[in-house]
Amino acid sequence: NFAALEKHGKSAVETFIADAKKKGISVHIWMQVFYTGGKWISATNGDGSYKYSFFNSKIKEAKEYANLKGVAGVHLDYLRFPGTAYKHANGVEAINYFTKSLCNAIHKINSKLIVSAAVMPETDSNKYYYGQDIPTLSKYLDVVIPMIYKGNYAQGTSWIKSTTQKFIDMSNGAEIWTGLQSYYSDDDVSKLPASELKSDSKAGIDGGAKGIILFRFGLFNLFHFNTL
């Protein structure tokens, strides 16, 4: 992300991408959208108009990432409101517009780049609380990653499969990659046993996911993905 570029420079980041590629690893740049510097930023103004200036600055940032040599994609995080979308006129429409504009800008640079976004796992209420209109966003994004973090929702492994299936049913073109919590919960960051993490991953695959994302690095017990 921008911190890596600021700290190490473009050349070092591109070298990292090239080295990772030699090991069979594709690098996607993580990009925060409506949350930065510890603060949430609304996608709309008080009168319901879009924050075009902010949108343009974020699209410019995304284009810089898209131009990195060898990069595989750009991942959008915090593409949402913090549970308050219903209080903002045109909030859903603003996020749809921003996402469409950003995806078009990135794909214009390189149509093969994967634009993904993390979304909340609450399916029916995503739009109302977070402004995440999955059927519409999935028309523009290449990949939608629902954060199906069972520990945070006091759910079991079966919830991972059923929620993945719901997102697949809602998607209008984007692949669904299941996002998993590799630790017990935000209140207990102890690592899940590798066997449990494997079972959770299998639940996502059984639900139809085309990929599995583990959150987060440094907080998971490894297992061999080829055994899924």
What role is predicted for each listed range?
Residues 141-142, 146-157, 163-167, 172-228:
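Substrate-binding cleft of secreted/luminal carbohydrate-active enzymes
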Residues 21-27, 70-72, 111-113, 142, ...:
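Short, well-ordered coil/turn segments that N-cap beta-strands
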Residues 11-15, 121-136, 157-169, 197-200:
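Alpha-helical scaffolding within the catalytic cores
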Residues 54-90, 210-213:
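Active-site groove signature of glycoside hydrolases
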Residues 26-35, 75-79, 94-131, 174-185:
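Aromatic-lined carbohydrate-recognition surfaces of secreted/lumenal glycan-active proteins
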